[in-house]
Amino acid sequence: MKKIVLATGNQGKVREMADLLSDFGFDVVAQSEFNVPEAAETGTTFIENAIIKARHAAQITGLPTIADDSGLEVDYLNGAPGIYSARYAGEHASDGDNLNKLLMAMQDVPDDQRSARFHCVLVLMRHADDPTPIVCHGKWEGKILTAPHGSNGFGYDPIFWVPEENCASAELEPVRKKQLSHRGKALQKLFKAIEEQRTC
């Protein structure tokens, strides 16, 4: 099994990514195990922030690194919270704080104007100076509920309605979420890209 560093401090992402990556033969080590401090997310896009995080962790650990930058884009809010999803309610906001702020912002918004999507950008940096990191994007369409449902997942999962399953993301079984989610889709693309490079 190939060791790879996961460049995030978000424990929900660590659990979900470790589970997804183990399916593809990777031994995932969280950056916290190497005492890697969080990188300053100074980018203006998911791609920029993912590259910043991946390069930062690769420089410190000397190992290949995968970084994930993801977020929720709500049409009614002109794409917010977007790249600020993890800190929508403030710099050290909890998942609950962010979720509640979003529910307040969407209060009284009609059902046909609650469309939203999750985005996930994954970057694989083979080493800190990798000139051609692998960049993959996954998207998951849904809408914002008026109240939380379910106890699985993390972040905005309890208020993200999944039309094809007729439930909230937080009500999905983990195996099904892997198949549908923005992160699962981005990982499928990432491993396809890795396989293609191995055969070049």
Swiss-Prot record:
Binds 1 Mg(2+) ion per subunit. Gene3D superfamilies: 3.90.950.10. Substrate binds at T8, G9, N10, Q11, G12, K13, S70, F154, G155, Y156, D157, K177, H182, R183. InterPro entries: dITP/XTP_pyrophosphatase (IPR020922), ITPase-like_fam (IPR029001), RdgB/HAM1 (IPR002637). It catalyses: XTP + H2O = XMP + diphosphate + H(+); dITP + H2O = dIMP + diphosphate + H(+); ITP + H2O = IMP + diphosphate + H(+). The keyword Metal-binding applies. It comes from the Bacteria. It is an enzyme of class 3 (hydrolase). GO terms for cellular component: cytoplasm; cytosol. Mg(2+) binds at D69. The active site is at D69. SUPFAM superfamilies: ITPase-like (SSF52972). One of its GO terms (molecular function) is metal ion binding. Its cofactor is Mg(2+). Its EC number is 3.6.1.66. GO terms for biological process: nucleoside triphosphate catabolic process; nucleotide metabolic process; purine nucleoside triphosphate catabolic process. Keywords: Hydrolase, Magnesium, Metal-binding, Nucleotide metabolism, Nucleotide-binding. Homodimer. Pyrophosphatase that catalyzes the hydrolysis of nucleoside triphosphates to their monophosphate derivatives, with a high preference for the non-canonical purine nucleotides XTP (xanthosine triphosphate), dITP (deoxyinosine triphosphate) and ITP. Seems to function as a house-cleaning enzyme that removes non-canonical purine nucleotides from the nucleotide pool, thus preventing their incorporation into DNA/RNA and avoiding chromosomal lesions. NCBIfam families: PRK14822.1 (NF011397), RdgB/HAM1 family non-canonical purine NTP pyrophosphatase (TIGR00042). Belongs to the HAM1 NTPase family. This is dITP/XTP pyrophosphatase.
